[in-house]
Amino acid sequence: MKTTTDFLKMKAAGEKIVMVTAYDYPAAKFAEAANVDMILVGDSLGMVVLGYDSTMPVTVADMIHHAKATRRGAKDTFVVVDMPFGSYHGDVNETLKTAIYMMQETGADALKVEGAGDIIPVIQKLTTAGIPVVAHLGLLPQSAGVLGGYKVQGKTAEQATKLIEDAKQCEEAGACAVVLECIPHQLTEIVSAHLIIPTIGIGAGVEADGQVLVYHDMLSYGSHHVPKFVQQFANMGKEASEGMVRYVEAVKAGTFPAQKHFFTMKEDALDQLYGGVQS
């Protein structure tokens, strides 16, 4: 399994870091078999798995449930788990208790939090306690309402300057990596150059030190809206939909189950069942 030190070395060597989300055992198995470098159990599961309109309803219990399944499917991959909305915005000592609980319950290798500013003390508190933290800047899904929706961030010089400073503060606070979401690719290049820790982009251009995509988006699996920055590398949704239709048709037509799917009793057992007389 790779470690935070390995990711620093990969950045220094110019080797791209591959991260993908996973929320359950089979997805994690696929990801590990493909040799991804990191798996993110994101609170995006609220939208792509649980059917919510945003990530805000996702709870700590939700994250632990899905992270446990993911960890079982990817025992040898670096797993990052999101701290959900509201779990790290209050007293830092309470946040630390929650973070420790999540780490112990899930077997995660790191936790991820969104934002800078008031979140910097959280990053410091967790990393001082020995919990690796991945920061998240740019578009912050948990704060999308405050940001005016799911829009590109850092497009003005003022916004870009603030994001660069926020990234530096996250690194100084002890973050082991930073996710950059939906920012101009030129800004990604600048931020990446200013940091020792790796940047992981999502909708942030090729200049990031690594990339992350949502499993369901990249495989077209149940996603009704695909963002501009996503490339679909397979069409699982189409295959699943067509397979479901074929199943319904086969059952209705009486062609499933076929004889090869049957289990059979021996004749003497049948005789005993019917008392030697079969109708």
Curated annotation (Swiss-Prot):
What are the annotated GO cellular component locations? cytoplasm
What organism does the UniProt record list as the source? Answer: Lysinibacillus sphaericus (strain C3-41)
User: What Gene Ontology molecular-function terms does this entry list?
Assistant: 3-methyl-2-oxobutanoate hydroxymethyltransferase activity; magnesium ion binding
Assembly mode: Homodecamer; pentamer of dimers.
Where do the annotations place 3-methyl-2-oxobutanoate binding?
A: 43-44, 82, 112
Family note: Belongs to the PanB family.
Q: Which reaction does it catalyse?
A: 3-methyl-2-oxobutanoate + (6R)-5,10-methylene-5,6,7,8-tetrahydrofolate + H2O = 2-dehydropantoate + (6S)-5,6,7,8-tetrahydrofolate
Name the cofactor(s). Mg(2+)
- Keyword annotations of the record: Cytoplasm, Magnesium, Metal-binding, Pantothenate biosynthesis, Transferase
Q: Which PANTHER family match?
A: 3-METHYL-2-OXOBUTANOATE HYDROXYMETHYLTRANSFERASE
Q: Tell me the gene name.
A: panB
Co-factor binding comment: Binds 1 Mg(2+) ion per subunit.
The entry's function note states: Catalyzes the reversible reaction in which hydroxymethyl group from 5,10-methylenetetrahydrofolate is transferred onto alpha-ketoisovalerate to form ketopantoate.
Annotated protein name in UniProt:
3-methyl-2-oxobutanoate hydroxymethyltransferase
Biological process according to GO = pantothenate biosynthetic process
